[in-house]
Amino acid sequence: PDTEAVLSIHLFGHPARLDKIRTVCEENDLLLIEDACQSVGTKYMGQVTGSFGDISVVSFGHKKHIDAGGGGAVLTDDSAIAQDIRRAEKNIPRRDDAYISELFDAYRDIYYAIDDLKELATEPHALYESLPEAFHDLFQYGFKSKWIPNIRNGLNSLDEICQVRQNHATIYRNRLQHPKIVHPD
């Protein structure tokens, strides 16, 4: 009864079963939020991921399909939701690039230190979970117009980017053959 939305995550280019999820959302008057950060360009039932939900998010961060150096986008066709998003975006602080770079380096160093020591820690997941709060500024900063050319280039090259990723996936699938390995469809 307290649920207002369903967050559907498409992981490693594999779309969630959006037809079924969408039906549940419609039957229960729930918003569908799609996390399409790792599935930009992927199609499900002939439609691109990120276009099924009431709200969708995509990332332009490091190693994503469109790597603009950071940031992301919230997408919606609903004008009321779009207005709320624009209002909220105005309150996101603008951060200095050098500060963000310094934070990112420190975050990465601590993340991998935890990873190296996780066998010794009694609750390593708690250490990982503490990072977003400790590095709050790294996860919330305003959009930078300097990212626009990289985003535009990524959108224009999206088919090629997706093909390269598909080629890599095929290589992994072909080389990682073992009875205990189950590859996704």
Regions found by a protein language model. Give the residues of each.
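Active-site phosphate-binding strand-loop segment of PLP-dependent enzymes
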Residues: 1-83
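PLP-dependent aminotransferase class I/II
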Residues: 5-9, 14, 18-20, 27, ...
